[in-house]
């Protein structure tokens, strides 16, 4: 099994939970904190150099995504978040249960409210605040609707957690909610009881 601990930047090394999967080719540098059951996929880059990056639990950062910071602008990614292929999140806050679509860009100082979807290719401008449960499309990004789609995003995040855990045999009795391909089915402990 591939084991990755991250690279130091000015003496600061990443803090990566033992229950995290990091694919070969991914780069995690500096002040980066990654929560339990999250996954970082091929060639994704997280660079915590002039501020910190925090990634919550059960979150997946997909292939070629880039997370970076700016002075006084950390990059904070919540729990149960999917950051799609080639997406960029720069010095911004993404709250829990969000989906950042493929090749979307979230610029410095932006805040993405809980349960929101940023569509593929969308551009969230500097300091733009997206309300919770919003769908954002276009360049520049505009809220086109709000909806209660948190459950769908949550299921997507759980699907990634479950798939990497099973494929790599890392957590045969993985804790937390499970996704059976259609719905959230509770915890593995619930199933055992």
Give the ranges of each region predicted by the language model:
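Glycine-rich hexapeptide-repeat left-handed beta-helix
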Residues: 1-11, 15, 49, 55-57, ...
